[in-house]
């Protein structure tokens, strides 16, 4: 299984959301990349997939929406180990279920505090590391 990198990619078509989220993550010393569109996000992932450990992904974006980006990440052998948290204002059960079906590793509402965002990111990354350790032990 390929190892994932150390960067977090923030994808949102609202620059203020990107900047605020990036500021919160950088306060905790996370290395970030940013994108304002689905197209740009896919290009960044293609060019930097070995460096990216997590994508915070908005669902509602013009042209290529977050679901399409998620599907392309999870269906590509090179990228599928990258963790994806859908980060959106959409709070309908349908959206949560669709995200899970497409392989999302988590779901966050944008009306979240910086502390709650950081706590959730830490939890997702910690859970993933524990899963990796279990997998390594099973292979021994």
Q: Model-derived features: where do they sit?
A:
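Charged docking surfaces used in two-component/phosphorelay signaling
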Residues: 19-27
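C-terminal output helix
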Residues: 112-121
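Short, glycine/charged-rich "phosphate-handling" switch motifs in NTP-dependent
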Residues: 105
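Receiver (REC) domain active-site loop signature in two-component systems and cognate sites
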Residues: 61
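Acidic, metal-coordinating helix/loop segments flanking the phosphotransfer/catalytic sites
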Residues: 34-54
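CheY-like receiver
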Residues: 129-140
